[in-house]
Each structure stands twice: as structure tokens, then as C-alpha cells.
Amino acid sequence: MEQEQDTPWTQSTGHINIQKKGNGQQTRKPERPNSTQLMDHYLRTMSQVDMHRQTASWKPWPSLKNPTQESLKTRVLKRWKLFNKQGWTS
């Protein structure tokens, strides 16, 4: 008889139903999540993705239509100096 493996859903949320077989062994059978549990799981996952996206992205510079390499370098250096003054707690 094939034993069911935990899915990422059951590992992350712990919705496990323990059942006993006829020979006394315990099997772990994932419960079917309801819509509230699925929505909660989805929202937690998406908020983690959104936090990562915010920390990994740069703000666009819409004021620069045709930037030259020198103007970009100046702008980046100004932002870098400002960032260093504020420190990592900004």
C-alpha cells in the first residue's frame, strides 16, 4: 500500500490527520483545507513575496527621460551618500 507524503501545504500549516491502519501502524493523511485556511495561506505567502519585492526593487526615476551616464552617476552617488547618512534603519 502506498503511503501519502506531506505536501508543502500540510508541512507549513500542520493540517495533519493521524489514522491507524489495521496492523496498528499510524499513517498521516492530510486534511482537505477549507477556503478560509487557503485564503490565509495565500495572504501570508503573498505578503512575504511583497515584502521581498519592496526590499529588492529600486524606485523608478520618472524625471529622467534621456539620462546620460554622468547624470546617472551623479544621481546614484547623491542617493548613496544620503542612504549612508540615514544608515540601515531607514
Curated annotation (Swiss-Prot):
Stretches for region Disordered: 1-36, 50-70
Primary location group: host cell
Subcellular location as annotated: Host mitochondrion inner membrane; Host nucleus; Host cytoplasm, Host cytosol
InterPro entries registered for this protein in UniProt: Flu_proapoptotic_PB1-F2
Superkingdom as given in the UniProt entry: Viruses
Region listing for Mitochondrial targeting sequence, in residue ranges: 65-87
One GO-annotated biological process of the protein: symbiont-mediated perturbation of host apoptosis
Site label Low pathogenicity, positions: N66
One Gene Ontology CC term in the entry: host cell cytosol
Disulphides: none
Pfam families attached to this UniProt entry: PB1-F2
The entry's keywords: Apoptosis, Host cytoplasm, Host membrane, Host mitochondrion, Host mitochondrion inner membrane, Host nucleus, Host-virus interaction, Inhibition of host innate immune response by virus, Inhibition of host MAVS by virus, Inhibition of host RLR pathway by virus, Membrane, Modulation of host cell apoptosis by virus, Viral immunoevasion
UniProt family annotation: Belongs to the influenza viruses PB1-F2 family.
HAMAP family the record matches: INFV_PB1F2
More info: Is not encoded in all strains, and seems to be dispensable for replication.
Function text: Plays an important role in promoting lung pathology in both primary viral infection and secondary bacterial infection. Promotes alteration of mitochondrial morphology, dissipation of mitochondrial membrane potential, and cell death. Alternatively, inhibits the production of interferon in the infected cell at the level of host mitochondrial antiviral signaling MAVS. Its level of expression differs greatly depending on which cell type is infected, in a manner that is independent of the levels of expression of other viral proteins. Monocytic cells are more affected than epithelial cells.
Protein name: Protein PB1-F2
Species this protein is from: Influenza A virus (strain A/Duck/England/1/1956 H11N6)
Gene: PB1
